[in-house]
Amino acid sequence: MADIDNKEQSELDQDLDDVEEVEEEETGEETKLKARQLTVQMMQNPQILAALQERLDGLVETPTGYIESLPRVVKRRVNALKNLQVKCAQIEAKFYEEVHDLERKYAVLYQPLFDKRFEIINAIYEPTEEECEWKPDEEDEISEELKEKAKIEDEKKDEEKEDPKGIPEFWLTVFKNVDLLSDMVQEHDEPILKHLKDIKVKFSDAGQPMSFVLEFHFEPNEYFTNEVLTKTYRMRSEPDDSDPFSFDGPEIMGCTGCQIDWKKGKNVTLKTIKKKQKHKGRGTVRTVTKTVSNDSFFNFFAPPEVPESGDLDDDAEAILAADFEIGHFLRERIIPRSVLYFTGEAIEDDDDDYDEEGEEADEEGEEEGDEENDPDYDPKKDQNPAECKQQ
């Protein structure tokens, strides 16, 4: 038995010697090839990958990994850079305050144009032929003869129809053309919004805390007695002491609506529902009437109140976040460019912006696909652990 074991050991030793001889004869290229194959096998092992990722996380993905390993003297210099960054944020805050002052200054220059817009929409002023002259891009190649023919046909159509005053349903059309606003407008809101004459933005006075007010001007109507509905947005342009590096320009801190004086039976923000209740003992049935909230654009003027603690439930936070977005959109886009949202041209421009971003993303995807087809491509080399974590 011992002889058999010795024989097997001798054969094993001989095999190892043969392997060593073969390895010595292998070229450098073969050694590299085997190393590459071994690397591929390791990268396909989930346990090895997990261990490697954990180590990378400790070094790079968590800030403390690399930063904590720095010498103390280097950490001191990093702290100095942080203090410089705080000062940069403070300067940036002053920059935005001056931008707000410029907006207030130029609002005065814009106002005569917006006043003329208001007068045309509401049939107070009839623009002259010269003011109405407009040459769309598609008319560049149209002959004078065709233009004259089209003009005559338009005049005939105008004669057949009754003469409308101003631009009917201007603001309602704007709202319905913009997804962000049309989602808020219910069918029962539309008859009321037909009475909307104008939307204005007013900025806070110099030296006052940053804020702006949206004014919705209505003509007399059968729904409420208010001539103007307002929404005030309070803003802040200063870094938060507890987190100065998060500063990214002015932010809306809160908003206040107004009371709508609804006429009797015309409040579209409420609805009455009837429920039948059956008595368990006697079996009798009674009808109970209850008033509950109703979806409406006019809920925009009754935002959730923020308690002194600042704590809000998830629903209230979502409503306020959407409210702030809408207020900013009305101020920055709708009011200054309303005619382009009425015609739909601004919406097409917005869509083009999104399309360009989508095309860039598609091109990046194609490039990534080409890399994945490369047998020597290692996706781990291209990944930035910090970016992956943020996603």
Curated annotation (Swiss-Prot):
Changing E130A: Impaired binding to histones and ability to mediate histone chaperone activity. A lipid is attached at C388 (S-farnesyl cysteine). The modification Phosphothreonine is found at T62, T64. Ubiquitously expressed. It is found in: Nucleus; Melanosome; Cytoplasm. One of its GO terms (cellular component) is cytoplasm. SUPFAM superfamilies: NAP-like (SSF143113). The modification N-acetylalanine is found at A2. The modification Cysteine methyl ester is found at C388. The keyword Lipoprotein applies. Residues 1-32, 132-163, 346-391 are annotated as: Disordered. Keywords: Acetylation, Cytoplasm, Lipoprotein, Methylation, Neurogenesis, Nucleus, Phosphoprotein, Prenylation. One of its GO terms (molecular function) is histone chaperone activity. Residues 389-391 form a propeptide. A motif (Nuclear localization signal) lies at residues 273-279. InterPro entries: NAP-like_sf (IPR037231), NAP_family (IPR002164). The modification N6-acetyllysine is found at K116. GO terms for biological process: DNA replication; nervous system development; nucleosome assembly; positive regulation of cell population proliferation; positive regulation of neural precursor cell proliferation; positive regulation of neurogenesis. Belongs to the nucleosome assembly protein (NAP) family. This is Nucleosome assembly protein 1-like 1. It comes from Homo sapiens (Human).
